[in-house]
Amino acid sequence: MKSAHDRDALFAFHYKYVIISLYINSCIRFWRDGLRPCAARVSLQRSPHRKDVAFIKAKHGKGTVQNSRHTHSGGAQRAASLWKQVLLTLLIFIALLALIGGALWQNICYNRTHYTAEFYQIHSRKLTQSCRVVFLTDVHLREYGQDNCDLVQDIRSLAPDLILLGGDLVTYGEGSSYDNMLSLCSQLNQIAPVCGVMGNHEDELYFLNGDQALVEKFTAAGVTILRNEEARYTVHDNVISILGVEGSPKDFYNYGASVFMDAAEQQTDYDLRICLAHVPTYFTEHLENYSFELGLAGHTHGGIVRLPKIGPLYSAEEGLFPDYAGGSYGLANNATLIVSRGLGDSSWVPRINNVPELSVIDID
């Protein structure tokens, strides 16, 4: 969670960003107002070539030759001055690159060891008492503290009524051991009921690698994995329905998700319905046609790189500048979709200006 120290670190990074911008503007003005006119003067006022000096000697005598030598000496001085200015610009440019590189590296390292709790407020039509949901997604074997002790302690302090998982707790292709994630799930199960869906990395392990015991392992750790299924929990005398949709948007009709959602649509005996899907575009392409009040997704890692005043840079489904890569969005069925930036990484591309997220949703 974001402490005072973390906020100071973020402030320091943004301060460096301002200093970098000032350096860039200074270099641009230096070239425009200094180097370019100086280069023009040296070009226009350079001394005559040697054969021109000889011609001037014969025609005009010593006085002219002395003037020519004087002009040649002045041109050399101006050229030397120009080279000094070029060297100074080069040194400033190198220092600027070092400053930018250092700031980026500091930001990357920060994003690998810190996360922030993002709080969301949702209003329900039928709940008689508020409830708190903690949502984790895209952990990708990341650990915060030994055996995730820091993460577990923070979640315990939040006192959630339910803990929901958005998939990709593991990473496909990084070995078959995910004991740290099973340990995390066991610890979370001691805090509140835990259920969730599989992400594309679990799907690849399950279907491509043939790890049929994957679901059983998470079940043994206390997690209810929903594969086009519903789970129900009673929280403060309110019945909360959790729908878990499997796969990606292209799988909606082929692997039973449409049949499951059609059947779930006929049920009305609940006070709150939450729909889980790993990929956020699943909601905009299919799920917003059904009745629920809150949708939860991950997968995008917050767009990997978040540009100041622009937002997320890229997601696999939407390409450059995606619309759904971190935050809260309204859907056509008047539900709220929350897309978490997730807690880890799955590729060699690091997060930049994109702090990992633990989502905390208060529903009243």
What are these regions (language model features)?
Residues F11-Y17, Y23, F30, F55:
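Aromatic (phenylalanine/tyrosine) cluster motif
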Residues D52-K57, G61-L127:
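N-terminal membrane-anchoring alpha-helices
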Residues F119-V134, V223, E230-G244, T268-I274, ...:
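Beta-strand-turn-beta hairpins that frame and shape the catalytic cleft
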Residues S130-E216, A220-T224:
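Membrane-embedded segments
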Residues L136-T137, I163-D168, P193-N200, L226-N228, ...:
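Active-site neighborhood of phospho(di)ester-bond hydrolases with catalytic His/Asp-centered motifs
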Residues N209-V223, V235-A277, F283-E285, W348-R351:
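Binuclear metal-dependent hydrolase catalytic cores centered on His/Asp/Glu-rich metal-binding motifs
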Residues P280-S359:
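Conserved beta-sheet core of the metallophosphoesterase superfamily
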